Amino acid sequence: MNRPRIYSLIVGLVFVALIAVAGVNLISTKNKGVLGAHDEGDLPLAQFAVPDARSGASGDANIAQDDCDASQIPCPSGDTRTPACKVSVPGAIRVCDLFDKPLVLSFWFTRGGDCEDQEDVFEQAYRRYFPRVNFLAIDVRDSDSEVRKLIAERHWTHPVGLDRDGALSNLYRVGGCPTFVYAYPGGVLQHTSIGRLDQQRFFANVDALLTATKQRDETLR
């Protein structure tokens, strides 16, 4: 499936600050809004590759796009970085490899109050819906050892990637912890949700994604 070349969900690289406001865990970016604050459906997701938390792989997230001319991410002069979806590094998770099915992303961090409990809900959804739906959790700026400890203690089996410097969360304009991103096959945004969801509501969102995917497929035929 050909994906649009205009990556409207992305902004330049800046560091993110983690703050708590009115009980909601927020990630501040320099962008004018956060993902999910406006009607942004049907936009293509930006490409990325992240170290698998279980693999011991080192390095930051690769957010280089495959088309510098069309991408809204600035490509520095002389940049030779391999596009994210073309990396072949052991221990890397490429989001493009998950575009074959509906996809749910979760952005979270350990300083985010009940974010760890929300990852438990994410795990329950993974066990219920995979392999009909792909899932990937992205931890923002925690230590590798801390994330691996949580994975073991909480018996998570879903994939977990590492956003060590916060560049990926800024790329996606993540505005709160947790932020869930729901996408159609092909990596096209359906919708997002920010903040705590109980299991029933989260499962309802995944069911809605599956229903919308079926309807979209029928429309595109």
Question: Positions of the model-derived regions?
Answer:
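Conserved redox-active cysteine motifs that mediate thiol-disulfide chemistry
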Residues: 99, 107-124
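Hydrophobic beta-strand anchors of alpha/beta hydrolase catalytic cores
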Residues: 104-105, 135, 180
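Short, ordered coil/turn segments that flank beta-strands lining enzyme active or ligand-binding pockets
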Residues: 53-54, 88-89, 185
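Thiol/disulfide oxidoreductase modules built on the thioredoxin-like
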Residues: 100, 149-157, 164-217
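Extracytoplasmic
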Residues: 43-45, 90, 98-100, 130, ...
